[in-house]
Amino acid sequence: MAGKPKLHYFNGRGRMEPIRWLLAAAGVEFEEKFIGSAEDLGKLRNDGSLMFQQVPMVEIDGMKLVQTRAILNYIASKYNLYGKDIKERALIDMYTEGMADLNEMILLLPLCRPEEKDAKIALIKEKTKSRYFPAFEKVLQSHGQDYLVGNKLSRADISLVELLYYVEELDSSLISNFPLLKALKTRISNLPTVKKFLQPGSPRKPPADAKALEEARKIFRF
């Protein structure tokens, strides 16, 4: 029997959080090996564990996978969260790439200069309301089904609900005019595996604060 997937990253959201979400939603228990210093990261680099000298890295099925999207694709395929055929996978890819664009803006927000932060938040809110939320509301409206693709849970639904929580942290009113997105968030959040992940004490990570940001700076030296 294969061991649990082992996640190598620092103790924060960053680019590992979507992987945590997807594994949790699939009902997969995993271990986390936190990188606590630049020396820890250097050791992984020096022993050949990181193909491109970068994390996240996930040990799974005898592999040391890097690159967030590659890891997500593998997990989604392994746990039947990637559609039934090539057309459904194309839709899932298209939707998740769109989500990734907005998620990247939110991910980088703590790194911006203080004098730029308000403008960045305003831009995120504007794009959320005018571009991203309307697009996904329209998808759900177009087929009247419970999930984005094939009327079956996929990584696209998990990624979207993760994103909805992040947007809610910025401004909880942004979702108010999108009833189908609200319903999707409730539906996915009530799945037993996701509900467990949303509880206190789970591997889910909180928003980055000044302490977490300083820790990341020391590890990654940016």
Curated annotation (Swiss-Prot):
Record's keyword annotation contains Cytoplasm: yes
Cellular-component GO terms for this entry: cytosol; extracellular exosome
EC number per UniProt: 2.5.1.18
Residues reported in the UniProt entry to bind glutathione: Y9, R45, Q54, V55, Q67, T68
Residues of the GST N-terminal domain: 3-83
Xref: Gene3D superfamilies: 1.20.1050.10, Glutaredoxin
Modification type N-acetylalanine: residues: A2
EC class: transferase
Catalytic activity, as annotated: RX + glutathione = an S-substituted glutathione + a halide anion + H(+); androst-5-ene-3,17-dione = androst-4-ene-3,17-dione; pregn-5-ene-3,20-dione = progesterone
Keywords associated with the record: Acetylation, Cytoplasm, Lipid metabolism, Transferase
Modified residue annotations for N6-succinyllysine: K4
Main localization, broad class: cytoplasm
Gene Ontology MF: a single term: glutathione transferase activity
Subcellular location: Cytoplasm
GO BP: glutathione metabolic process; lipid metabolic process; xenobiotic metabolic process
Domain of life: Eukaryota
Domain GST C-terminal: 85-207
PROSITE patterns in UniProt: GST_CTER, GST_NTER
Keyword Transferase: yes
CDD domains: GST_C_Alpha, GST_N_Alpha
A Pfam family the protein falls into: GST_N
Assembly, per entry: Homodimer.
UniProt cross-references to PANTHER family, sorted A to Z: GLUTATHIONE S-TRANSFERASE, GLUTATHIONE S-TRANSFERASE A3
Family classification: Belongs to the GST superfamily. Alpha family.
Function: Conjugation of reduced glutathione to a wide number of exogenous and endogenous hydrophobic electrophiles. Catalyzes isomerization reactions that contribute to the biosynthesis of steroid hormones. Efficiently catalyze obligatory double-bond isomerizations of delta(5)-androstene-3,17-dione and delta(5)-pregnene-3,20-dione, precursors to testosterone and progesterone, respectively. Has substantial activity toward aflatoxin B1-8,9-epoxide.
Protein's name according to its UniProt entry: Glutathione S-transferase A3
Organism name: Homo sapiens (Human)
